C-alpha cells in the first residue's frame, strides 16, 4: 500500500475514533424534555438523564416517541394471542440514561419485581401500552405492562418470568 494512502486511512480512523466519544457524550448529556401530559412512568435510581428533580418522568407522547415493538403473543393471563404494542423497555432505560444491571418495577398497587436488564436486551421486552390497538386501562393491565414474547420463547413460561411481568406499572428504579 502506498504510504500516503496508509496515512490517510490511519488519519481517518483516528478522527472517527476521536469523534465517537464526543458524540456519545453529547447524546448522554442530552436533556430529557419535561412531560406535557399526565405522567405515566417515573424512572429513578442510577440514571443520568432527568427532567424533574433526580427522576426521569414520561408522559404518553414521550413513551410513544421511543423505539417500540409489537408482540403478538398469548400470556399466562391471556390464553388467546393478542397484539401488544409499546416502547422497548431497553429504550426507556436508555432515554433515562440508566446505568444499572437490575431494575425494580413497581405497580400502582405497590406490587414490585426485580428484573435483570439483560432480560430486556435478550428478549426485546416491551412496556405494553396498547392491546389490540386500544390503550390499556388500569383495570385491564394498563397503563403499562412488562411484556415478554411468551409464544416466541417457550422457555419464558416460568413462575419467575410471570412474577417479572408486572402490570399497572408506574415506576422503575434502576440499580
Question: Which residues does each PLM region occupy?
Answer:
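Bacterial N-terminal signal peptides
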Residues: 8-19
